[in-house]
Amino acid sequence: MKAFLLVAALAMLFVLGPVLAMRPSPRQGQLARLRARAVAAGLRVRVEGGRNPGRVADYVLPWRLDDLQQVRGLRLVLRRGDDGAWEDAESLAAPAGILREVCEAVPAGVSALRSIDEGLAAQWNEKGRDEDVERIRDAL
């Protein structure tokens, strides 16, 4: 009888072990929440491949069809330096006052703002609160 219970317990461990291992970690759950909230807010999330722990994701506000003529050829690249100050990486076509407001509105984890073919992108480390997604959307 003891041997049967031992075998049954071992079998349960073999069944439950992989199931418990498939549960997402708290960080993975947070990322899923942030990305779902971004999609619901009208943003697209682009994550580069790889398992680099310092990676960032692009939160992209897509161009609207009526914007396409005005923004074709727009090149905007702003990077946040190590000291937290924004640096102009290329010549800017937008008025400086608007850019200053945008730079102040984004969360601290945003390391770059740029225009890409899909729309305006904020490069974010995704370390923040759920409300930061709306701050990014509103700033873009």
Tell me what each language-model feature is.
Residues 1-37:
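N-terminal signal-anchor transmembrane alpha helix of single-pass membrane proteins
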Residues 35-49:
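Membrane-cytosol interface motif
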Residues 26-27, 39-43, 102-106:
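Short amphipathic alpha-helical surface micro-motifs
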Residues 52-135, 139:
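Structured extramembrane domains adjacent to transmembrane segments
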